[in-house]
């Protein structure tokens, strides 16, 4: 059994422009084993997700829709999404006639607090959760699945926000 290691972009590097030679390898206690740079403050949260879900990859974004909706639904049990065809792109969902709930945890500067807050929801979360006022974490069996889950959840969050804006204007 190999000890857990993550391949990740170091802190301070533009994640949209990161090159393979800039990536670092981090162990289960956030020590950099290979590469130049420092592990980000959020490394321990990524580790917590991998340990709980057996994910092969974890991705994180800071979209407008995810950030705004996470604040709006904070304390309301998450963001309900149902009836959208795109739900079928999430692992385990076979029909659009499905309802999911994206969990939201309150933001904290303590990654330990964030990890403890999301831990009870990780097994049942639909491949992702939101940190209120911050952004979306999504995961999957590998990088491709994680990217698919991230893109689908971001799409559904944008749909939800647009739906709310239309309802408000009507």
Description of each model-found segment:
Residues 1-170:
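Glycine-rich flexible loops
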């Amino acid at each position: 059994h190999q000890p857990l290691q993550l391949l990740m972009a170091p802190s301070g590097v533009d994640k949209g422009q990161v090159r393979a030679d800039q990536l670092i390898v981090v162990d289960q206690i956030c020590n950099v084993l290979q590469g130049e740079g420092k592990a980000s403050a959020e490394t321990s949260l990524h580790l917590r997700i991998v340990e709980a879900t057996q994910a092969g990859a974890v991705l994180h974004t800071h979209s407008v829709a995810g950030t705004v909706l996470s604040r709006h639904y904070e304390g309301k049990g998450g963001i309900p999404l149902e009836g959208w065809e795109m739900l079928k792109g999430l692992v385990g969902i076979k029909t659009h006639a499905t309802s999911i709930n994206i969990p939201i945890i309150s933001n904290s500067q303590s990654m330990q607090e964030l990890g403890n807050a999301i831990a009870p929801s990780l097994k049942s979360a639909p491949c992702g959760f939101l940190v209120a006022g911050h952004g979306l974490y999504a995961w999957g069996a590998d990088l491709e699945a994680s990217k698919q889950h991230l893109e689908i959840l971001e799409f559904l969050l944008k749909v939800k926000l647009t739906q709310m804006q239309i309802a408000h204007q009507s």
